[in-house]
UniProtKB/Swiss-Prot annotation:
SUPFAM superfamilies: Snake toxin-like. InterPro entries: Snake_3FTx (IPR003571), Snake_toxin-like_sf (IPR045860), Snake_toxin_con_site (IPR018354), Toxin_cobra-type (IPR054131). Keywords: Acetylcholine receptor inhibiting toxin, Disulfide bond, Ion channel impairing toxin, Neurotoxin, Postsynaptic neurotoxin, Secreted, Signal, Toxin. It comes from the Eukaryota. It is found in: Secreted. GO terms for molecular function: acetylcholine receptor inhibitor activity; ion channel regulator activity; toxin activity. This is Long neurotoxin 1. Gene3D superfamilies: CD59.
């Protein structure tokens, strides 16, 4: 009986994965944080605003449940699903 109970506990722990959550870089501080439960996708969103010529592209890093869809054609979104895979872009 104890063996059956122990087996059930182990199977439950393996199936629940002990509440693992993805880690992604988050802006504005560009630091690694745990994503909220259910958000397993990291994303990097880049776009130009009115100051793009003097300051460069804007960058937004974060977590999402699914890869966000760009609302405008000049917005670029890259998604990934490994811990801290959405590093700040390197500009040429």
């Amino acid at each position: 009986m104890k063996t059956l109970l122990l087996t059930l506990v182990v199977v439950t722990i393996v199936c629940l994965d002990l509440g693992y959550t993805r880690r992604c870089f988050i802006t504005p501080d560009v630091r690694s944080e745990r994503c909220p439960p259910g958000q397993e996708v990291c994303y990097t969103k880049t776009w130009c605003d009115g100051f793009c010529g003097s300051r460069g592209k804007r960058v937004d890093l974060g977590c999402a449940a699914t890869c966000p869809t760009p609302k405008k054609k000049d917005i670029k979104i890259i998604c990934c699903s490994k811990d801290n895979c959405n590093t700040f872009p390197k500009w040429p």
